[in-house]
Amino acid sequence: MSQAAETLDGWYSLHLFYAVDWASLRIVPKDERDALVTEFQSFLENTATVRSSKSGDQAIYNITGQKADLLLWFLRPEMKSLNHIENEFNKLRIADFLIPTYSYVSVIELSNYLAGKSDEDPYENPHIKARLYPELPHSDYICFYPMNKRRNETYNWYMLTMEERQKLMYDHGMIGRKYAGKIKQFITGSVGFDDFEWGVTLFSDDVLQFKKIVYEMRFDETTARYGEFGSFFVGHLINTNEFDQFFAIS
């Protein structure tokens, strides 16, 4: 049996994707529509107060293409807090006009593939804590995709030795480091939580960097032999004070 990688786990993560039902929203009188939007704004501004206490974070993005219109990403210390947010969101009047298109449940994760030996408690390391319990950058653009490590008769990631996986992940990581300062990456583990094994969330002020890093990674052995991917979602940052314009219908 191959040795399993150990993980450090941080905040729980919930990506919620919605399409706006514009046809139904269009027939709502303007004053009622404005009230829906105001209630939605207040809800998100209230949930965002966790930032000041460093007990979570969240981000809102306008997704490009027909897979979704909005992405709401929430990070919280407990899974049940994510349930509470989703339940309270579903009670909002605006929820009647937002059609769920996709969701992803996971937890911020760091593996020990590239970790050196140390006697210190990693959860007390400031650098590690900042990665497990992050302050999201709220860059202009976001890219999210789920992924698996391939396991079939020809290529099975989980049958490789720890040393083989460490070498592959080191080479993989070297490519990622080339994009430091251009892309901020968050890996969330989802084995037992969702249909894929990991979620990858990228932030950048230059949307083209997503294409560049994903393409370059295709030539890396870790990805070429062992990577399997779900749908990609790309979008632009939207703040709650922009909701009036976003939901406006002339």
From Swiss-Prot:
Catalytic activity line of the entry: Fe-coproporphyrin III + 2 H2O2 + 2 H(+) = heme b + 2 CO2 + 4 H2O; Fe-coproporphyrin III + H2O2 + H(+) = harderoheme III + CO2 + 2 H2O; harderoheme III + H2O2 + H(+) = heme b + CO2 + 2 H2O
Enzyme class, spelled out: oxidoreductase
Family that this chain belongs to: Belongs to the ChdC family. Type 1 subfamily.
Cofactor(s) required, per the database record: Fe-coproporphyrin III
EC number(s) stated in the UniProt entry for this protein: 1.3.98.5
Protein name: Coproheme decarboxylase
Sites where the protein binds Fe-coproporphyrin III: 131, 145-149, 172, 185
InterPro entries xrefs: CHDC, ChdC/CLD, Dimeric_a/b-barrel
Cofactor details (free text): Fe-coproporphyrin III acts both as a substrate and a redox cofactor.
Role according to the record: Involved in coproporphyrin-dependent heme b biosynthesis. Catalyzes the decarboxylation of Fe-coproporphyrin III (coproheme) to heme b (protoheme IX), the last step of the pathway. The reaction occurs in a stepwise manner with a three-propionate intermediate.
Active site: 145
Pfam family, one: Chlor_dismutase
This protein's pathway: Porphyrin-containing compound metabolism; protoheme biosynthesis
GO biological processes: heme B biosynthetic process
